[in-house]
Regions:
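Amphipathic, Lys/Arg-enriched alpha-helical "gate/interface" segment within cytosolic domains
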Residues: 2-144
Length: 144
């Protein structure tokens, strides 16, 4: 179900209509294109962990503008897939209101699995706004 795209950078992975791209040094970009079931969520999580596991910190930039239905299994798998990752911020782009509620619940589960309260989730209309927030968050974490 997953494949490494031959037309993109070697750090770009497609799982069905969904995409994960590792953007060094610390951004995991995810774009959902349609319904997300447990099988796709598990494959996406397994592939993305190859890049994110062991990194000192990870920001997630998640494009949900084209997401469809998100199954209960997909929500559980997505939260579990964050275990042992050093996620320090999640920027969600283009999520409609009902999806924001689901994302909020998954984000809370991620925080509980990481046992950290310093992994904020923020919502943005555009990818540029999400990237700007990540840059500001990175600067705040790095200090003066």
């Amino acid at each position: 179900m997953s494949e490494i795209s031959t037309s993109a950078a070697p750090t770009e992975i497609k799982v069905g209509r969904h995409l994960f791209r590792w953007e060094p040094p610390d951004i995991g970009y995810v774009s959902y294109g349609g319904d997300l079931d447990g099988e796709a969520a598990a494959a996406l999580s397994a592939e993305s962990r190859k890049f994110t596991l062991g990194k000192p910190r990870v920001f997630l930039l998640v494009n949900m503008a084209r997401v469809g239905q998100i199954s209960k299994e997909a929500r559980s798998v997505s939260a579990a897939g964050s275990k042992d990752l050093s996620i320090v911020g999640i920027a969600v782009v283009g999520a409609p209101g009902h999806v924001r509620l689901v994302v909020g619940l998954v984000s809370r589960a991620v925080e509980l699995m990481q046992r950290t309260q310093d992994s904020p989730t923020r919502f943005f209309a555009t990818e540029a706004e999400g990237r700007q927030w990540i840059a500001q968050r990175r600067q705040a974490l790095d200090g003066p």
